[in-house]
Amino acid sequence: MAEKKQMILNRLPAPTWNWLRVNRTVLDWENENEIDLGAVVRSVQGKENEPLRLEIRGEGEYSRKDVDVTAEPDSAVTIIETFGAEQNLLVRTHLTARRNATIRLVQIQNTQEGSRLVSAVEGECEEGGRIELYQVLAGKGDVYGDSKIELNGDGASFEAETGYLA
């Protein structure tokens, strides 16, 4: 029997509205048979005209993809992640915006009925750094989002916009 581990999402630094049970989500996730879809690692310098496009498709019952993008000082990059899955897909995206750099992450969910998508976005903004997260949730299935962005300098900023079909 495959080992299942618990994944905790949306862990708040201080419990609020605990009686509504919105402080965190606990998911069972099978690590033993998880298919590693590999990693994408990029370091960007300058202002990129072409976005980095990533088509991420789940394989098998459980699969995982890791993405790590660093925008070097005074750089700008747009990343477009399109998710597709029939079963369970975990996408872990790590972003680093160096001094006065901007990262725009656009996530488009296009998963199937009965699927489960977990999108975990972590990031760090240095002085004047900015991360923008735009999510379009138009597919089917269950979607879990977990975002944690550290603002580590003067003028560092984060903005998020999410749109979904109910």
Predicted segment positions?
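Short, Gly/Pro- and small/polar-rich lid/capping loops
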Residues: M1-G38
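Conserved beta-strand/loop scaffold segments within soluble protein domains that form the structured core
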Residues: K4-K5, L37-A166
